[in-house]
Swiss-Prot record:
Its EC number is 2.7.4.6. Major role in the synthesis of nucleoside triphosphates other than ATP. The ATP gamma phosphate is transferred to the NDP beta phosphate via a ping-pong mechanism, using a phosphorylated active-site intermediate. Keywords: ATP-binding, Cytoplasm, Kinase, Magnesium, Metal-binding, Nucleotide metabolism, Nucleotide-binding, Phosphoprotein, Transferase. One of its GO terms (molecular function) is ATP binding. This is Nucleoside diphosphate kinase. Homotetramer. GO terms for biological process: CTP biosynthetic process; GTP biosynthetic process; UTP biosynthetic process. InterPro entries: NDK-like_dom (IPR034907), NDK-like_dom_sf (IPR036850), Nucleoside_diP_kinase (IPR001564). The gene is ndk. One of its GO terms (cellular component) is cytoplasm.
Length: 141
């Protein structure tokens, strides 16, 4: 089983879409391994998105991600990373395929509801940013 990390971003929480998005994720065959609601500071958001620090949108991204609560989750499924990227759709909801999470729920490229890891290696690193080893342990249920 492969794992990936997702974050339901502050716009998702603000629009009260947590349940609808999780329902779509679970119906696509993903199992939620770990989940929490948290609020990132500008510093922690900056650390998480440090890979984008030289990009023009970095400041806005950090500000947005620290603007309210978010919900990071570790998900599990065969081919989790690629399948989840397909499920969430393109970064810009206007370009996202019909029926994808961003197509259904996102308003803009900047506030696009959800983050998904782009590789298995990054998924592991990103999961470690939010969850301890104990929190991410496999639970049979």
């Amino acid at each position: 089983m492969e794992r990936t990390l997702t974050i339901l971003k502050p716009d998702c929480v603000r629009k009260q879409l947590i349940g609808a998005v999780i329902d779509k994720i679970e119906r696509a065959g993903f199992r939620v391994v770990a989940m929490k609601k948290t609020k990132l500071t500008a510093q922690t958001a900056g650390e998480f998105y440090a890979v984008h620090s030289q990009r023009p949108f970095y400041g806005e991204l950090v500000e947005f991600m620290s603007s309210g609560p978010c919900v990071p989750m570790i998900l599990e499924k065969e081919n989790a990373v690629a399948d989840f990227r397909t499920l969430i759709g393109a970064t810009d909801p206007a370009e996202a395929a019909e029926g994808t999470i961003r197509n259904l729920f996102a308003d803009s490229k900047g506030e696009n509801i959800i983050h998904g890891s782009d590789s298995a290696e990054n998924a592991q690193i990103e999961a470690g940013f939010f969850f301890s080893t104990e929190e991410a342990v496999r639970v049979n249920n």
